Amino acid sequence: MSDSISVIKEKLSEVTSENDPFFQKCIQDERKGVEKLVQSVRRKWEKEAKLLVKLKEMTQYETDLFQQGYKYIAGVDEVGRGPLAGPVVAAAVILPADFSVVGINDSKQLSEAKRDALFEKIKKEAIAIGVGIIEHDVIDQVNIYEATKLAMCEALNQLTPEPDFVLIDAMPLRYTEAELSLIKGDTKSISIAAASIIAKVTRDRLMQMYDEKYPGYDFANNMGYGTKKHLLGLDTIGICPIHRMSFSPVKESKLHFDSLN
């Protein structure tokens, strides 16, 4: 083959099958550069095949429910149970039956750029999205477990149309009789994964905003979790208005600064 490496790379970007005549010619090309391109294309196809398998696995619950006659299946997930500051945020998402986005997964396993791109995709294509935000003071009043349930119910209450089946990550909600709680549901259900992404991006953006309002805790990077920089902020500055007073490190910081007065 007389084509240059750069030309071959360009042509291979449009090849989709091992049986493509051009790809077969590339296999026969003994140049090291072409061999590397062939290996790269094969790795790309292997990755894409795995993502398609994962997508099929993650739509299985929804597919079964659609076949049973359910029309509006809501996935529900939360983010922010563990942080020392900020709200707990839950999202509920109803996706159309033909929603098919390769790469969607538990939000914690995705890069920020990938989450942001999927966030926009979900917002554009979802039938309905609800977001529940329960602030730090309510968390202190009712405990984080109950606050999480409140956030989930708030998110579900915002959905129009109302869901006729609810898939929930991990915790039983008892929002409706037609619901199923899935352990690690954000890796098993595309609806829950979508809710996970909506909740994560929503809360991260809130915490980035709070970082500007309350500097010194590194909220933009730790999202309120108890990292070294956050704990250092508690030790040197004390608490701020969005800290959860019922969480031990925050409580200890307040006691320390109160004792100095």
Swiss-Prot record:
> This protein is called what?
Ribonuclease HII
User: Under the cellular component aspect of Gene Ontology, which terms does the record hold?
Assistant: cytoplasm; ribonuclease H2 complex
Q: Signal peptide: which range, if any? A: none
Its domain of life reads Bacteria
Query: What cofactor does this one take?
Result: Mn(2+); Mg(2+)
This protein's gene is called: rnhB
Record the organism: Listeria monocytogenes serovar 1/2a (strain ATCC BAA-679 / EGD-e)
Q: Which reaction does it catalyse?
A: Endonucleolytic cleavage to 5'-phosphomonoester
Q: Name one GO molecular function term.
A: RNA binding
Q: Where in the cell is it found?
A: Cytoplasm
